[in-house]
Amino acid sequence: MKKLLFLLLALICMSTTASAAKVICGDERTDVWVPMLRGKKVCLLTNYTATINGKHLIDVMLEKGINLVAIATPEHGLSGKASAGAKIASSTYKDTGIPVWSLYGKTRRMTSEQAAQFDVLVFDIQDVGVRFFTYYVTMLYTFDALADQGKRLIVFDRPNPNGMYVDGPILEEKHKSFVGGLPIPVVHGLTMGELAQMAVGEGWVTKVDVEVVCCQNYTHQTRYQLPVKPGPNVRTMQAVYLYPSTCLIEGTVFSEARGTDFGFEAYGHPDIAPTGFSYTPRSIEGAKNPKHQDKLCHGVDLRKVPKNQILKEGFTVKYVIDAYNRYGKGEELFAGNRKHFFHRLVGVDYIYEMIIAGKSADEIKAMWRDEVEKFKVLRRKYLLYEE
């Protein structure tokens, strides 16, 4: 019966796609979700990306008379201004008295006591479709509490800007962490609604009733332009497309250009030979105390790499290999706790080992090709939109 309901939902979602029409996100479909939420006590898991024509979903819900009893927020907070990894305190929303629960503070999991205070949890956050982008993990970390209290999740779905392809190694269980919550490729090609249903369907998380308010006029080949930046250091579509590969620089001693206005669109280090391009990371909003703060970094500028080329190439370790060669100090590229974090990002051991052994990016990419093809078949069961 549940398989039949999922198939029906998928057919409904797919029937609303049209490549030429404007994409309509789930939260814009007030005619669908207002009746679903009317008379319910609602908790909204969200951040600054949940806007409808410039107005935040929180305010739209209140205007529509929805009984919003709590707001929960992920990494970077409701405003999106907190730096990566910075703990965020709980607060209240404006002058409404509605509590804002930080799920990136003393705890990263919703408690059963919190879940007891509402009837339904709504999730609406713009993601980038990458395994180490943490918003989906925050969503999954609510499932235990929801299941304990018998509460359901409604996802107001949004397009995946990297949803056109699937690439990268499958996360190994021993490397599971907050930057890798599921056994999926680095670029998984799923929307948050699809991913939530896959996680439940495959038994990867505690079973929760998940409903999805689908996007309209969207397919997985839609080149969706994000109306707002999805993170404080992912500011442009160039950064969104580069992020799956350049985020690996975080697992090295090189700068990933945090502390500039082109984060993840460049990388560099103070101690390599001049390259003709340099930048100086500064402590700025959303990037407090970046690597090599106030030091001139020589490096590589990726801002003019054609977007079609980035997408065609997919997930690659070539930037880490380039940093390794430019640095010239072998394993010191991963000094301190960087090696451990690099393993968490890539989700496997062999990438590090092959880089040290001098293997090429193409040789390394060949290692995950077969498992990605198998994942694509599994993924297809949960697609709500045409491929």
Language-model features: where?
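Bacterial Sec-dependent N-terminal signal peptides
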Residues: 1-22
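Conserved anion/nucleotide-ligand pocket segment
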Residues: 175-246
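Glycine-rich, aromatic-lined ligand/substrate-binding cores of catalytic
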Residues: 217-295
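Glycine/threonine-rich flexible loop motifs
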Residues: 127-139
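Short internal beta-strands
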Residues: 69-75, 156
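Glycine-rich oxoanion-binding loops at beta->alpha junctions
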Residues: 89-117, 130
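Conserved functional hotspot residues or short segments at active or partner-binding sites
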Residues: 263, 268-369, 387
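Glycine-rich, charge-decorated loop segments at or immediately adjacent to ligand/cofactor-binding or catalytic sites
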Residues: 80-85, 154-176
